[in-house]
Amino acid sequence: MVREIVHDPMFLQRKSEDATQADLQTAQDLLDTLRANFDRCVGMAANMIGVAKRIIAINDNGKYLVMFNPEIISKFGEFETEEGCLSLDGERKTVRYKTIKVKYFNENFKQIKRSFSDFTAQIIQHEIDHCNGNCPRSEERRVGKECRSR
């Protein structure tokens, strides 16, 4: 089911709880919502649809991938970039890594460790930030600021 996008920074700044197999429907709703917004969005976290669970979905060059409880276990190749977000207006500067290794569970709750690079790595980092409650303020453009201070 396609869900409405959450824009409330107070909700988005809350750290999400670990997902369980009971959250499979939320993952499907997240995927449906991502697909419905394919023209303006390449990734989403569950809190963007109002569910504070550690679930992300990404569009990796036309192939959709859902991750439960994703965690970056290694990273290298730091760079600065600007990113937009479906939940927030405008673009913000941020620091990302060119290559990351992520530990996550798939839809069968089998643990996976996989490396990602370039734009796909950037998408995953952005969505994991959502899971961690890292939400840049729309009016703040400096690197490292979050909406926690609101």
Listing of model-derived features with the role each one plays in the protein:
Residues 140, 144-150:
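Positively charged, low-complexity/disordered segments
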Residues 1-142:
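Positively charged
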